[in-house]
């Protein structure tokens, strides 16, 4: 079986799929067209760059039912009654227009709050227009890429709003990148400008010899805080010493760029819904990161899908006039980017920005200041918060929605959260390549399901084997997604695009799972994280969920290690809550709940587990 599995994989990788995306091109006279990896739309004698194409309505990217047999969409029978099966993007234009509309409609409302300072929609409008004008004055034109390297501070939404309104493309950069990682992303994207917080400017300085970015704008933590900003900068630089010495010749200060831009005229740029909006880099935890090309349609579709989904909760629990989102996940990550920033602006909500969510006491102090209604997060964050005594004392009555994503939500964590807050965690699923939300549990549910829910409106999910054949209900295979939120492809990587997106438009997620008879999908694990014990598939998530039930364990991570008899065995890394917990205690606990081949053969205790900046556990580092 293992040999057959390897051979079919090799055969599949040798196939060439020149047709990467299929959709109906809705322009007058348009027909069946194909999106190729160079960004051109080709079909029926027309050749246009995606960045030059205007459509009167959204191309149904990835929804090409005509390219494959009709699906039995069994999930529709489980849909909330008020949620339509399909979304209407006929009036969608661009993200910049969405932001402009929000600024007009919600002028005096706070859009973002950080460290006690409100940024109203009027402020967002004026500042982003000024920065957009400045970028245009530096010679940046439609389609140019601008990198953004900042945590959750007020300058972030100003910057991405300016970029998008100027018809440019946002390249989100993890501020904790090393010089090597930063060089790769800037060079790969061909960024013409970089906006960076001074805390990370030293990394940029170390990269200068290997990059060519003509415009570098440097922000400070206190830029948007008036006189208080001087005190903030003093504390950050001198007291906490969070700003290493740096020197970037020719850089421009963020405040100076804003001031200069206000004196210039901003020229609105016509942007089509199929134009690029984001290069969202992904895959950095598994190899060289690559840019997922997300169009304005991709993001707007996901905003529309999630808004329809969230309306169910508002219908059941009410919707306050001024809605507050907790924004603890980094905005450069696709989850917070769409669910917090984009949906928040569409709804006229306030996002409470948390620059450093790992500082749990400071995080909780911010939560004490405001009623919070929408709380996106991930398993490790929820777990860490519930171990804080002051968090337990917060007023949770206003909480309408808790949205879990980014990694599997463990049932013990979900049950404890519901008991503590009175609000269950609604788990969803997605990736950078799907903008990100592909599926979610219904928001009128009253308890945690342990699944990733139902496909979003206008979205199809199938389970396929290594040969690309659909699996029957209940059978494990790779989760594949098709819908208007699925990316155009990987930037300058046609081979990887053709491997990831099948001819019928389905995107291979790399996650293993199955669909039940009601259309709910359950993830069993990442394909690459699967452990093979004597020919049996073992999924780390299952072992970690069992370990999470032990009162003496804070968190754990399961990996496979070589074994001469069984090929691999399970090793469990554990962070203890109970200092007296022993290896035998853990093994005995697991033995009562797991069949023999799934049980950990080794247990190693750690003070902490390696994680990404978003909080995902890095199993790869533990394996290495």
Tell where the protein language model's regions lie, with residue ranges.
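Conserved structural elements of the adenylate-forming
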Residues: 125-130, 259-264, 273, 292-317, ...
């Amino acid at each position: 079986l293992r040999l057959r599995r390897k051979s079919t994989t090799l055969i599949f990788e040798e196939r060439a799929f020149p047709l990467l995306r299929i959709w109906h091109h809705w322009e007058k006279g348009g027909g069946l067209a194909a999106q190729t990896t160079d960004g051109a739309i080709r079909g029926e004698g027309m050749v246009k760059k995606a960045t030059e194409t205007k459509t009167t309505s959204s191309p149904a990217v990835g929804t090409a039912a005509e390219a494959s047999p009709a699906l039995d969409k069994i999930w529709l029978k489980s849909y909330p009654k008020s949620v339509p099966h399909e979304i209407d993007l006929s009036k969608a234009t661009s993200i910049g227009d969405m932001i402009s509309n929000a600024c007009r409609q919600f002028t005096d409302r706070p859009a973002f709050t950080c460290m006690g300072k409100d940024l109203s929609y009027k402020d967002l409008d004026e500042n982003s227009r000024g920065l957009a004008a400045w970028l245009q004055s530096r010679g940046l034109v439609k389609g140019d890429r601008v990198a953004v390297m900042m945590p959750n501070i007020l300058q972030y939404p100003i910057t991405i709003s300016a970029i998008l309104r100027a018809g440019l493309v946002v390249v989100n950069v993890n501020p904790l990148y090393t010089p090597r990682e930063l060089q790769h992303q800037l060079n790969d994207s061909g960024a013409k400008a970089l906006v960076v917080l001074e805390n990370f400017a030293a990394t940029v300085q170390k990269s200068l010899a290997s990059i060519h970015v003509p415009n570098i704008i440097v922000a400070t933590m206190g830029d948007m805080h008036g006189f208080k900003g001087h005190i903030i900068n003093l504390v950050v630089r001198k007291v906490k010493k969070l700003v290493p010495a740096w020197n970037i010749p020719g850089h421009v200060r963020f405040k100076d760029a804003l001031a200069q831009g206000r004196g210039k005229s901003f020229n609105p740029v016509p942007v089509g819904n199929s134009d690029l909006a984001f290069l969202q880099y992904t895959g950095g935890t598994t190899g060289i990161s690559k840019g997922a090309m997300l169009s304005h349609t991709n993001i707007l579709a996901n905003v529309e899908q999630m808004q329809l989904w969230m309306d169910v909760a508002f219908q059941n629990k009410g919707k306050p006039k001024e809605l507050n989102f907790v924004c603890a996940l980094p905005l450069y990550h696709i989850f917070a980017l769409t669910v917090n920033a984009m949906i928040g602006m569409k709804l006229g909500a306030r996002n409470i920005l948390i620059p450093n969510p790992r500082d749990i006491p400071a995080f909780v102090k911010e939560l004490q200041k405001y009623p919070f209604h929408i709380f996106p997060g991930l398993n490790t964050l929820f777990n860490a918060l519930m171990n804080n005594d002051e968090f337990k004392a917060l007023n949770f009555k206003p909480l309408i929605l808790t949205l879990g994503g980014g990694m599997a939500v463990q049932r013990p964590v979900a049950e404890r959260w519901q008991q503590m807050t009175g609000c269950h965690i609604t788990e969803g699923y997605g990736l950078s390549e799907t903008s990100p939300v592909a599926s979610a549990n219904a928001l009128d549910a009253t308890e945690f399901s342990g699944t990733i829910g139902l496909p979003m409106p206008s979205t199809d999910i199938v389970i396929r084997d290594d040969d690309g054949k659909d699996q029957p209900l209940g059978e494990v295979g790779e989760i594949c997604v098709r819908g208007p939120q699925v990316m155009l492809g990987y930037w300058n990587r046609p081979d990887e695009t053709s491997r990831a997106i099948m001819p019928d438009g389905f995107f291979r997620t790399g996650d293993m799972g199955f669909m039940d008879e009601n259309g709910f999908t359950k993830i069993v694990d990442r394909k690459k994280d699967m452990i093979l014990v004597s020919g049996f598939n073992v999924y780390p998530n299952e072992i970690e969920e069992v370990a999470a039930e032990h009162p003496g364990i804070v968190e754990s991570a399961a990996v496979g290690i070589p074994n001469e008899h069984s090929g691999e065995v399970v090793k469990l890394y554990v962070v203890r809550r109970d200092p007296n917990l022993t290896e035998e205690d853990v093994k005995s606990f697991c033995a009562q709940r797991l069949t023999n081949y799934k049980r950990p053969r080794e247990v190693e205790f750690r003070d902490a587990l390696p994680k990404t900046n978003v909080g995902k556990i890095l199993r790869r580092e533990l394996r290495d």
